[in-house]
């Protein structure tokens, strides 16, 4: 027996190639199955993109937190969307805030934040943060707890 609420999903349960770039990557959503407010966290410790100037690889640890309203993101589509940045040239700030803005556009969450903890290039780590506003009251919002980059120090 199949649940027709999920007929709109085109990636889950199928062999889906990695999209060429984030602009063409499909983010899929499903109806929020919960009535109570809650927070969902996605962690991508091996996010990659390319420097738009040199083409050198950039690496980040992403933490995405959101409080859903009517929709939740389907996790395989999120994984493929994030993977589509692998050969995409953009600065750290554009990647991090662009991911947050795309999720807001697709999901219309109560609240969302993303932390992009970028590994050093040229000796300088860059951390980029985006949020839609203050966290809602009555929902447990844990710290992202990603330590600052220390290298050998």
UniProtKB/Swiss-Prot annotation:
Gene3D superfamilies: 3.30.1130.10. It is found in: Cytoplasm. It comes from the Bacteria. It is an enzyme of class 1 (oxidoreductase). GO terms for molecular function: preQ1 synthase activity. Pathway: tRNA modification; tRNA-queuosine biosynthesis. Residues 1-22 are annotated as: Disordered. One of its GO terms (biological process) is tRNA modification. Substrate binds at residues 73-75, 92-93. Keywords: Cytoplasm, NADP, Oxidoreductase, Queuosine biosynthesis. Transmembrane segments: none annotated. The active site is at residues 51, 58. One of its GO terms (cellular component) is cytoplasm. It catalyses: 7-aminomethyl-7-carbaguanine + 2 NADP(+) = 7-cyano-7-deazaguanine + 2 NADPH + 3 H(+). Its EC number is 1.7.1.13. It holds the Pfam family QueF. Belongs to the GTP cyclohydrolase I family. QueF type 1 subfamily. HAMAP family: QueF_type1. Catalyzes the NADPH-dependent reduction of 7-cyano-7-deazaguanine (preQ0) to 7-aminomethyl-7-deazaguanine (preQ1). This is NADPH-dependent 7-cyano-7-deazaguanine reductase. It comes from Maricaulis maris (strain MCS10) (Caulobacter maris). The lineage of its organism: Bacteria, Pseudomonadati, Pseudomonadota, Alphaproteobacteria, Maricaulales. The gene is queF.
